[in-house]
Amino acid sequence: MKEMKVIIAGPRGRMGHEAVLLMERTEHFNLVAAVDYKHGGEKISDLPGMPALDATIYADLHTCLEEVEADVLLDLTTPEVGKQHVTLAVERGLRSVIGTTGFTEEELKQLTETAKEKAVGTIIAPNFAIGAVLMMKFSQMAAKYFQDVEVIELHHDQKLDAPSGTAVKTVELIRQNRESKQQGHPNEVEQLEGARGANVDGIHIHSVRLPGLIAHQEVMFGGDGQMLTVRHDSFNRASFMSGVKLSIETVMNLDHLVYGLENIID
């Protein structure tokens, strides 16, 4: 396979560290630079626990793109920084794979239009774990037969956004096979505000944030005399790397924005 030159934004995070290791062990990936505001001017190999790669770290993406030729930007930063990075990448015609979440419908619409206008491949993935993508697709299938459903997503206590992008995407897919419906008793009253979670067309989303968790979600469907639960668990960040690898390889052949890994897997 042809060599792909990659920039990683956010190499110090747990996901970023796994992505750097992915670069090292994948023959056709070449890490040409990284972006980290705290370590500008250093090398990847200077960071604790990193492999002996000589990619330069830049303090900001703009400077990096001025000095480095790359094929793909892999962004694993925070929601706000990720939004800035993907906007800059699309405007500069650089393909990007974005692993941060928290995009609004309006932001996705604007990015989709710009990516189409620039004919630049872009993938935004709420979750890179193949199992999580299958969990979402199975939930979409089940919604055709079970109209009553609630989503419980559980993540580590350092996650910034709630609900998770995976939960939002799951509900989006479920709604394609389910009419808007108010679940529970029509006169239901919350004794404590927020007790029933977020409500999207009658689908309740509950967010749990605790140390010890990584990324987990279960989708509970209820019917007369039966329950169906679809669950996925990521026990470490290595679970996301197969999806990261697939996304980088796939975005090279795209000329538009794709939201969600389920749209690029067979």
Curated annotation (Swiss-Prot):
Matches recorded under InterPro entries: DapB_C, DapB_N, DapB_N_CS, DHDPR_bac, NAD(P)-bd_dom_sf
GO cellular component: cytosol
Protein name: 4-hydroxy-tetrahydrodipicolinate reductase
Residue numbers binding NADP(+): 38
Catalytic activity: (S)-2,3,4,5-tetrahydrodipicolinate + NAD(+) + H2O = (2S,4S)-4-hydroxy-2,3,4,5-tetrahydrodipicolinate + NADH + H(+); (S)-2,3,4,5-tetrahydrodipicolinate + NADP(+) + H2O = (2S,4S)-4-hydroxy-2,3,4,5-tetrahydrodipicolinate + NADPH + H(+)
Compartment(s) where it occurs, according to its Swiss-Prot or TrEMBL record: Cytoplasm
Active site (catalytic residues): 155, 159
GO molecular function: 4-hydroxy-tetrahydrodipicolinate reductase; NAD binding; NADP binding; oxidoreductase activity, acting on CH or CH2 groups, NAD or NADP as acceptor
Annotated residues for binding of (S)-2,3,4,5-tetrahydrodipicolinate: 156, 165-166
Family: Belongs to the DapB family.
Taxonomic source organism: Bacillus anthracis
NCBIfam families, per database record: dapB
Single Gene Ontology BP annotation: lysine biosynthetic process via diaminopimelate
Function (record text): Catalyzes the conversion of 4-hydroxy-tetrahydrodipicolinate (HTPA) to tetrahydrodipicolinate.
Annotated pathway: Amino-acid biosynthesis; L-lysine biosynthesis via DAP pathway; (S)-tetrahydrodipicolinate from L-aspartate: step 4/4
Pfam family, any one: DapB_C
Binding, NAD(+): 10-15, 99-101, 125-128
UniProt EC number: 1.17.1.8
Entry keyword set: Amino-acid biosynthesis, Cytoplasm, Diaminopimelate biosynthesis, Lysine biosynthesis, NAD, NADP, Oxidoreductase
